[in-house]
């Protein structure tokens, strides 16, 4: 068997591009190798943050998201962005689980109950999603639309619910039907520590309108809670009904849509609506059509509007199906990223996949050893390139990220210089065997060590672009405007392999 000429992807973790050289450890370090590559080789910048990697607009990237996107060859949307995007695209209102539950309630002249954390916090839920659900129920002909508001005050300021409640009172006035039916703090409705007596307060409010307090409007109910010195999180069960209105309780045949997308604080209250529940004695147990926005737990037998997205034909899986060999190699700090996250959350190796782990140094903080284990990692990587065993090699160097996180500028420069030396040896080995190499990053970090706004030490990731450099014999010209999810299709193209249909990323080579 002839020796393989590998295609290697080297991910310099935390190695972003920033024009401003102030407090920029990457620009100011002595990097003769990277300077020569950028002067002489095909290169471009690609996006590694925000919507381009499935995060909210403007949000900095991170290693988990970055490697997931690189390995998937498509943008992998986080729940918040996935649902927000579905609303913008008009797909939300066609979601089968929601359509079925609402239509069944409308047909039987029953109520549609929508509940969730009423907040723009974006951690467990987003009120924009709840707004879309109310509009959808109204558009599909629901006459009784009852909104049950769990109040936040943890991911938002402690007393900030009034704007949200007013927004929904205005929406119901505009629709001419529906109303806010109840208020309760997340302390009760969203417990996650088996404090079932708290959850029971919320359950009894939803199913019996059993409440310590009542109010004619949601805003009036909130003002009364503030007068009792209860912040949003701790607002006691409050039933909302004006004179002459019936209790807005969950009854047989009603639809109930739970609009939280984060599972950990949604599970307990949801389990209270499932047969066989024993957390507390339920005075009533209505036969409702309950829809979870996302899957809160695999063992909860209820409909899910947005089931977990399983990633078929990630880069590693696809290479395996083509009978190709691949190596994943990094030091401890980023080993999970080039294996588990790169494989789309799959723990086990694919056939033909090998893994090598180099131990990260045992130091209190990495500014004390900015080169980390790059010499040992490079030695193993060069040996793998020259071994002729692998079609593809994926390697992550953690230095720019891990030393960037320490905030120690001089150490970050040293980390970048150690990386440069390592990259030089890798480039040499690739040229020697006639292979191909792509150098990139998963997100930025070390290019901004001082926060330009505050003047304080900047230890976080950035939302800046990252480099993409090609080394090899092919006449490559890169397109502009790429992103991390374009790397897998680009690599398959460079290797002369077919690209699976699931990979919606672009090939960045013209």
From Swiss-Prot:
Mn(2+) 2 binds at residues 13, 63, 442-443. Mn(2+) 1 binds at residues 401, 405, 461. Its EC number is 5.4.2.12. The active site is at 63 (phosphoserine intermediate). InterPro entries: Alkaline_phosphatase_core_sf (IPR017850), BPG-indep_PGM_N (IPR011258), Metalloenzyme (IPR006124), PGAM_B_sf (IPR036646), Pgm_bpd_ind (IPR005995). Coiled coil: none annotated. One of its GO terms (cellular component) is cytosol. Keywords: Glycolysis, Isomerase, Manganese, Metal-binding. It catalyses: (2R)-2-phosphoglycerate = (2R)-3-phosphoglycerate. Substrate binds at residues 124, 154-155, 186, 192, 262-265, 334. It holds the Pfam family Metalloenzyme. One of its GO terms (biological process) is glycolytic process. Monomer. Catalyzes the interconversion of 2-phosphoglycerate and 3-phosphoglycerate. Belongs to the BPG-independent phosphoglycerate mutase family. This is 2,3-bisphosphoglycerate-independent phosphoglycerate mutase.
């Amino acid at each position: 068997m002839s020796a393989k000429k590998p295609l290697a992807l080297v991910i310099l973790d935390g190695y972003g591009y920033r024009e401003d050289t102030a407090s920029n450890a990457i620009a100011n370090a002595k990097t003769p190798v990277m300077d020569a590559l950028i002067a002489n080789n095909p290169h471009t910048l690609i996006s590694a943050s925000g919507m381009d990697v499935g995060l909210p607009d403007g949000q900095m990237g991170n290693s988990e998201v970055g490697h997931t996107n690189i390995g998937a060859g498509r943008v992998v949307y986080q729940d918040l962005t996935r649902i927000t995007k579905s609303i913008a695209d008009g797909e939300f209102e066609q979601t089968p689980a929601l359509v079925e539950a609402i239509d069944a309630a409308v047909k039987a002249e029953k109520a549609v109950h929508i509940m969730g954390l009423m907040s723009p916090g974006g951690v467990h839920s987003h009120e924009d999603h709840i707004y879309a659900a109310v509009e959808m129920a109204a558009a599909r002909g629901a006459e009784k639309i009852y909104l049950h508001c769990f109040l936040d005050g943890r991911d938002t300021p402690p007393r900030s619910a009034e704007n949200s409640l007013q927004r929904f009172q205005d929406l119901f006035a505009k629709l001419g039907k529906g109303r806010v039916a109840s208020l309760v703090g997340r302390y009760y409705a969203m417990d996650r520590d088996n404090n079932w007596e708290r959850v029971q307060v919320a359950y009894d409010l939803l199913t019996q309108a059993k409440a310590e307090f009542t109010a004619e409007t949601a805003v009036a109910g909130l003002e009364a809670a503030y007068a009792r010195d209860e912040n949003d999180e701790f607002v006691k069960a409050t039933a909302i009904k004006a004179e002459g209105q019936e209790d807005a309780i969950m009854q047989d045949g009603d639809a109930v849509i739970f609009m939280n997308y984060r599972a950990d604080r949604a599970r307990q209250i949801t389990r209270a609506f499932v047969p066989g529940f024993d957390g507390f004695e339920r005075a009533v147990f209505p036969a409702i059509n309950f829809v979870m926005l996302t899957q809160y737990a695999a063992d909860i037998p209820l409909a899910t509007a947005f089931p977990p997205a399983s990633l078929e034909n990630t880069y590693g899986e696809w290479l395996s199906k083509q009978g190709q060999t691949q190596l994943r190699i990094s030091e401890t700090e980023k080993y999970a990223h080039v294996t588990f996250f790169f494989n789309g959350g799959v723990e086990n190796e694919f056939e033909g996949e090998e893994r090598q782990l180099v131990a990260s140094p045992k130091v209190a903080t990495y500014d004390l050893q900015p080169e980390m284990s790059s010499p040992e990692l490079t030695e193993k990587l060069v040996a793998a390139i020259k071994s002729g065993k692998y079609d593809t090699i994926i390697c992550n160097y953690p230095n720019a990220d891990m030393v960037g996180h320490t905030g120690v500028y001089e150490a970050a420069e040293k980390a970048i210089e150690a990386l440069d030396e390592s990259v030089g040896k890798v480039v040499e080995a690739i040229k020697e065997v006639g292979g191909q190499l792509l150098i990139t990053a998963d997100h930025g970090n070390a290019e901004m060590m001082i926060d330009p706004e505050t003047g304080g030490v900047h230890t976080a990731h950035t939302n800046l672009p990252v480099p993409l450099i090609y080394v090899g014999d092919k006449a490559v010209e890169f397109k502009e405007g790429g992103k991390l999810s374009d790397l897998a299709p680009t690599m398959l193209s460079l290797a002369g392999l077919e690209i699976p249909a699931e990979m919606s990323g672009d090939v960045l080579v013209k």
